[in-house]
Regions:
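Adenine nucleotide-associated cytosolic modules
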Residues: 1-138
Length: 138
């Protein structure tokens, strides 16, 4: 059973009928993904329809955000209340030297949009707390 078949059974990301067709540019961009039998075009449509919220735009969140954007995840949310520091640059690959002193979520959002302008980025310059979790995760 492919991931698409399991998604149909489990109802993940909605039914195939509700998925918007990929544009010509998206078909070209994600052609290699669509060749994978477990993904195909409908799987790429589901990836585009998905939403991911990353807590932290640092050492782990930074590369994850880039790979998610490259894969075509439709919406990437970022939560981080920190600023880019020069000591971050050797391991937080989403940030550039010019971003030092800027909020990490702003720097990361800019890099994500540069990599894949079709991805919606929602930046939250805050920490995830019990008080704001429902609003941020909802």
């Amino acid at each position: 059973m492919s991931a698409v078949d399991r998604s149909d059974r489990d109802g993940a990301c909605g039914s195939v009928e509700r998925l918007r067709p990929l544009s010509r540019d998206e078909l070209e961009r994600y052609h290699r993904n669509a060749l994978v039998p477990q993904v195909e075009v409908v799987g790429q449509q589901r990836i585009r329809a998905s939403r991911v919220l990353l807590i932290g735009a640092g050492g782990l969140g930074a590369p994850a955000a880039l790979y998610l954007a490259a894969a075509g995840v439709g919406t990437i949310g970022l939560i981080d209340d920190d600023d880019v520091d020069v000591t971050n640059l050797q391991r937080q690959v989403i940030h550039a030297t010019a971003a030092v002193g800027r909020p990490k979520v702003d720097s990361a959002a800019e890099a994500i949009r540069a990599l894949n302008p079709d991805v919606e980025v929602v930046a939250h310059r805050t920490r995830l707390t019990a008080d704001n979790a429902r609003d941020l995760l909802g």
